[in-house]
């Protein structure tokens, strides 16, 4: 199943924390999560699917001091 994944790492290492994890499973659902000290938090899943496989889209993420 095709998917898109965007991760905002807290450091330049692969095993670092992930402040924001965004994964689109085209045609199915979207998952958002974060990882601290090697442990994933509770994922947030959305069945609201605005993305379609093969269709172009713009991804814009606002980064504020206290939230995304």
Swiss-Prot record:
Q: What is its main location?
A: cytoplasm
**Keyword Cytoplasm in annotation:** yes
Instruction: Show the coiled coil region(s).
Output: none
Question: Which GO biological-process labels does this protein carry?
Answer: regulation of activated T cell proliferation; regulation of T cell anergy; regulation of T cell cytokine production; T cell apoptotic process
For the Galectin domain, which residue ranges apply? 1-68
Instruction: Please give the Gene Ontology molecular function terms for this protein.
Output: carbohydrate binding
Q: What are the subcellular locations of this protein? A: Cytoplasm, Cytosol; Cytoplasmic granule
Keywords in UniProt for this one? Cytoplasm, Lectin
Please name one Pfam family that this protein belongs to: Gal-bind_lectin
Record keyword Aminoacyl-tRNA synthetase present? no
**What role does it play?**
Regulates immune responses through the recognition of cell-surface glycans. Essential for the anergy and suppressive function of CD25-positive regulatory T-cells (Treg).
Please report the name of this protein according to its UniProt entry. Answer: Galectin-10
| Gene source species | Pongo pygmaeus (Bornean orangutan)
């Amino acid at each position: 199943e095709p998917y898109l994944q965007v991760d905002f790492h807290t450091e330049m290492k692969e095993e670092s924390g992930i402040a924001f994890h965004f994964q689109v499973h085209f045609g199915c659902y979207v998952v958002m999560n974060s990882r601290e000290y090697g442990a994933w938090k509770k994922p947030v899943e959305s069945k609201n699917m605005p993305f379609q496989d093969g269709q172009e889209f713009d991804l814009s993420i606002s980064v504020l001091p206290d939230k995304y």
